[in-house]
Curated annotation (Swiss-Prot):
Keywords (A to Z) from UniProt: Glycoprotein, Glycosidase, Hydrolase, Secreted, Signal
Protein name as annotated: Trehalase
Active-site residues (renumbered): D338 (proton donor/acceptor), E535 (proton donor/acceptor)
Any one GO cellular component localisation term in the record: extracellular region
Binding site for substrate: R184, W191, D192, N228, R237, S238, Q239, R302, P303, E304, G336, E550
Signal peptide: 1-32
Annotated organism of origin: Pimpla hypochondriaca (Parasitoid wasp)
GO biological process entries: trehalose catabolic process
Gene transcribed to yield this protein: tre1
Catalytic activity: alpha,alpha-trehalose + H2O = alpha-D-glucose + beta-D-glucose
EC number(s) stated in the UniProt entry for this protein: 3.2.1.28
Alphabetized InterPro entries for the sequence: 6-hairpin_glycosidase_sf (IPR008928), 6hp_glycosidase-like_sf (IPR012341), Glyco_hydro_37 (IPR001661), Glyco_hydro_37_CS (IPR018232)
Known tissue expression: Expressed by the venom gland.
């Protein structure tokens, strides 16, 4: 298993990965196209307990726990060699067919779960942050203050004992405290943390934000990328690349240029990982573009959802096809959208099932927009630091991705950008909030901003988004998957609202305000009724938590609270209902 202490030496495979990334970034500064496609590298975790092998398979298929994540979040009371030896002894004694009671007893004797991740009180937490005074409505101000108290409830730190025996744990040891989403998610997650950090910085928690960034930067140094979350079983995949915008947020609030100077090389490595591991050549109208998709090289079910993945794949007889299926499930998890009809390719478009998942064959709008913004930000960072050669290099990459976004993803007929189907060489003309992501990342010709804003607003209206009082749904297809209708997710609300605002076009800004206020009111209604904030909501029933997926709805909730703060910052005069006068702001 990969060592997880800060001082642990990287494996030969990890060193090779880091060299590849470094070479990709420094080998040729002459052309943005110099970073080519390579075969995605395989898992960094080979643990027989947490990542792959007969022990993991037997426990998870034995249904010792209803939620498979529960098992892989346990730590071992002995070294892995003892854990595995005891398992082999059990298998020998039971003829390779232990029953559920025997497996439960084995887990009880060899694993524990307490005190691995411990509560933490952020020293920079403030009881009455200055931001609260900006919120004009007293009801919303009280709510915002309540959510500020939640930071203390969902703050964690990895226990010191983990660093003493990292091989016994699935948790990845990091030096600084962090914010967990809440509920079953008791480790840090990558893309969640962007919206969490928005909330932290608005409530004055600059040091906590810096610590979270340092944790992520240490992941890039140790593994070459940021895993999906803070567990070794997530080392098979990343998540949407938001580290560079997180640093930009931090710099906006602190002006800490020394932090940027110290870490600019690590930010380059993270972008290099995506540009070298996630790209593919896309040909349209006789021209070839380098574009990104979510893709994972990792066989077998996801450890934390082993049973669900195994059942889905059991009727696939061809081993190569089964591996592809598992990899596309993991790639969908890497996207953050696990799962959604967005990743289905079938004769009926998205109207299939998970058996039709084809994540690697879809060029997602937001991933390419994120990468364009990342390259653009790195160019700006290097300009600020006085590195003109590097600034030009990343500006060229940003220009290359901008051209691809314009030429491949833009749909003139729809007035937005659409995912591209590699298998059938065509746009996927279905509604997803990410269809306006280039407006969110400002990955567009600024001279056309108002045109794009007007067309995006018209597109959203045409697709009936104003009919959903509980938030903008992830799609318009009710599949039962959690990233489909009727679920409305906080980050997608942020993307749509800020996309419309970025256009500076009147109809777009009016719609942005309407959608943001609806979201605030729906969230507040749910909070008033339950005293909880949820990870997702029901677009059809304002304030009701969302459903579907592989686990029950989770409370907390990190990114939900962050988006509330974002919207209250954008619209400080917002009110809980229409009976209270609200000025434009």
């Amino acid at each position: 298993m990969a060592k997880t202490t800060p001082m642990a030496k990287p494996s030969v495979g990890l060193l090779t990965l880091q060299v590849l990334v470094f070479c990709a970034l420094t080998g040729s500064l002459a052309s943005a196209g110099s970073i080519g496609h390579v075969t995605p590298r395989s898992d960094l975790c080979d643990s027989e307990v947490y990542c792959q092998g007969e022990l993991l398979k037997t426990i998870q298929l034995g249904e010792v726990f209803k939620d498979g994540k529960t098992f892989v979040d346990h730590y071992q009371v002995n070294d892995p060699s003892v854990t595995v030896a005891n398992f082999r002894k059990l298998m020998a004694e039971t003829g390779g067919k232990p029953n559920k009671d025997q497996l439960t007893q084995y887990v009880k004797e060899n694993f524990a779960q307490e005190n691995e991740v411990i509560d933490w009180s952020p020293p920079d937490w403030q009881e009455n942050p200055e931001f609260l005074q900006r919120v004009q409505d007293p009801v919303f101000r009280k709510w915002a203050k309540d959510l500020n108290d939640v930071w203390k409830i969902i703050s964690r730190k990895v226990a010191p004992s983990v660093a003493e025996h990292p091989e016994r744990h699935s948790i990845i040891s990091v030096d600084n405290g962090f914010i967990v989403p809440g509920g079953r998610f008791q480790e840090f997650y990558y893309w969640d943390s962007y919206w969490v950090m928005e909330g932290l910085l608005l409530t004055g928690m600059k040091n906590t934000s810096r610590g979270i960034l340092e944790n992520f930067l240490s992941m890039v140094t140790r593994f070459g990328f940021i895993p999906n979350g803070g567990r070794v079983y997530y080392l098979m995949r990343s998540q949407p690349p938001l580290l560079i915008p997180m640093v930009d947020l931090y710099l906006t609030h602190t002006g800490d240029m020394q932090f940027l100077r110290d870490n600019i090389g690590t930010l380059e490595k993270e972008l290099g990982y995506f540009l070298s591991q996630k790209t593919v050549d896309v040909t349209k109208n006789g021209k070839t573009y380098k574009m990104a998709r979510y893709i994972v090289s990792s066989n077998g079910p996801r450890p934390e959802s082993y049973r669900e993945d195994y059942e889905l794949a059991k009727n696939i007889n061809d081993e190569a096809e089964k591996r592809r299926f598992y990899e596309d499930l993991k790639a969908a998890a890497e996207s953050g959208w696990d799962f959604s009809s967005r990743w289905y390719i079938s004769e009926n478009g998205t109207r299939g099932s998970l058996s039709n998942i084809a994540t690697r064959n879809i060029i997602p709008v937001e991933l390419n927009a994120f990468l364009q913004r990342n390259a653009r930000m790195l160019a700006q960072f290097h300009t600020t630091l006085g590195n003109p050669t590097k600034a030009k290099y990343y500006k060229d990459i940003a220009t290359s991705y901008q051209q691809a976004i314009d030429d491949v993803l833009w749909s003139e007929s729809e007035g937005v950008w659409l995912d591209f189907d590699l298998r059938n060489s065509q746009h996927r003309n279905y509604f997803f909030p990410t269809n306006v992501a280039p407006l969110y990342t400002q990955s567009f010709d600024s001279s056309k901003a108002q045109i794009y804003g007007q067309r995006a607003a018209a597109y959203l209206t045409r697709n009936g988004i104003l009919d959903y009082m509980g938030g903008t749904p992830a799609s318009l297809f009710p599949t039962g998957e959690q990233w489909d209708l009727p679920n409305a997710w906080p980050p997608l609300q942020s993307i749509i609202v800020q996309a419309l605002r970025n256009s500076n076009e009147e109809s777009a800004e009016k719609l942005a305000k309407e959608l943001a206020i609806r979201w605030l009111r729906a969230n507040h209604k749910g909070y008033s009724q339950s005293g909880q904030m949820f990870e997702k909501y029901d677009a059809l029933n304002p304030g009701k938590f969302g459903g579907g997926g592989e686990y029950v709805v989770q409370e907390g909730f990190g990114w939900t609270n962050g988006v509330v703060y974002e919207f209250l910052n954008s619209y400080p005069n917002a009110t809980p209902d229409d009976n209270v006068h609200m000025n434009n702001n």
